[in-house]
Amino acid sequence: GLGDVYKRQVPSVTTVLDNMSDKKSSLSEWRNRVGDIEADRVMKEATDIGTMVHLSLENHLNGIDEDIFSANSLGNMAKRMSKKLIDDALVNISEVYGLEVHLVLNKLYAGTADCIGVIDGKDTIIDFKTSKRIKKKEWIDDYFLQGCAYANAHNIMFETNISQVAILMVDRDLMYKKFLIKENEFKHYTNLWKQKLLKFHNTFSW
């Protein structure tokens, strides 16, 4: 489809951030330490949980009642994490405009926002995140940069004026945390994203 053509020609937001990140080295150090088999297992486990939780939230917001969880301990964990987000996070969202919104900004970058809706009366890019442990704010710059990138693309594509990003995170101990980026912080991360994007396009030819 057309989406695939665009995706091939345009780097995703996560591709840009991964290539511009200082975290790459710590990730490969960890992989060297635990070995490929264990690293792959841990990554797959995290991905599987994340996928189930995202699908469950999407179904819930679409009014679809379907059990999508695998019948094992991971599925059980994902189910509990989803319930926590539904009970604690979704109450923050007073209106949902769109789910899994595909965004492409003229040959610069592309991405898919989990949710676009209203939080605290403001139009917001909303991302649901699952984690082993709730992360400290200073560790998740990339999540904020990603949200600002999506806001920027959405604003240009649809002539909106979104200037708020919400990261709604749940961990395996069923702790929930809302990170809200707005006003000066939103400007800061938007500028930082533009710098990284520029550097990426100057480093790699797309």
Question: Model-predicted segments: where are they?
Answer:
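A non-catalytic, helix-rich entry segment at domain boundaries
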Residues: G35-L99
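Short, small-residue-biased leader/transition segments that mark boundaries at the very start
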Residues: L2-Y6
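Mg2+/Mn2+-dependent nuclease catalytic core
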Residues: Y97-T203
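Short alpha-helix boundary/capping segments
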Residues: K7-V10, E45, E138-D142
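Residues that form generic nucleotide/phosphate-binding pockets
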Residues: V16-N19, R33, S56, H60, ...
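Short, flexible loop/turn segments with low-complexity composition
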Residues: N72, S205-W206
